[in-house]
A protein has these predicted regions:
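N-terminal FAD cofactor-binding segment of flavoenzymes
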Residues: 37-75
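Receiver (REC) domain switch-region micro-motif
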Residues: 3-4, 139
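A generic structural signal for short, well-ordered alpha-helical segments in conserved domains
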Residues: 16-17, 107
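Extended amphipathic secondary-structure runs
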Residues: 21-27, 48, 55, 113-119, ...
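N-terminal Rossmann-fold NAD(P) dinucleotide-binding loop
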Residues: 12-13
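Glycine-rich FAD pyrophosphate-binding loop
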Residues: 4-8, 17-41
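Conserved N-terminal helical subregion
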Residues: 66-141
């Protein structure tokens, strides 16, 4: 099976990684050279999704993730009044990870996989050419 994925975000990369783990050919298209932007962006992953991600998609060192066991939400209008409070003494509610750390780790590993091929979209006629070639079982944009 041949799958085409268009886009270079974490969602596309996670899907591509999961497919190549299942020995499915993936052609990964993106508009320009992927550059790593140093940013402070983080993403949150629930406990169950974290376990699934580690097992099925990409294992990343646990030291790169920060466990969150307590969340408090306040109102700007009501000073010092908690709107919601979530807390767990045993398990983490979710984990946060730097967006760049996860992306770099995944892209460096997936590029070594023989089922993965990365391509650059050079112009807007790419989409028409892609459809005419008809060499993919599924195209995901």
């Amino acid at each position: 099976m041949n799958i085409c994925i268009i886009g270079d975000g974490l969602t596309s990369l996670s899907l591509a990684k999961n497919l190549v783990n299942k020995k499915i050919n993936v052609h990964f298209y993106h508009k320009n050279k992927i550059e790593y932007l140093l940013s402070s962006r983080t993403i949150g992953i629930s406990e169950n999704n974290f376990e699934f991600f580690q097992k099925e998609i990409h294992k990343i060192a646990k030291k790169k993730f920060w466990p969150i066991k307590k969340i408090e939400i306040y109102s700007e209008k009501l000073v010092q009044e908690k709107l919601l409070k979530f807390e767990s003494n045993k398990n983490s509610l979710f984990y946060t990870v730097k967006n760049d750390d996860l992306y770099k780790s995944m892209i460096s590993e997936i590029c070594k996989n023989k089922f993965f091929k990365k391509n650059i979209i050079k112009d807007n006629s790419f989409y028409e050419k892609l459809l005419k070639k008809n060499k993919y079982d599924l195209i995901i944009n």
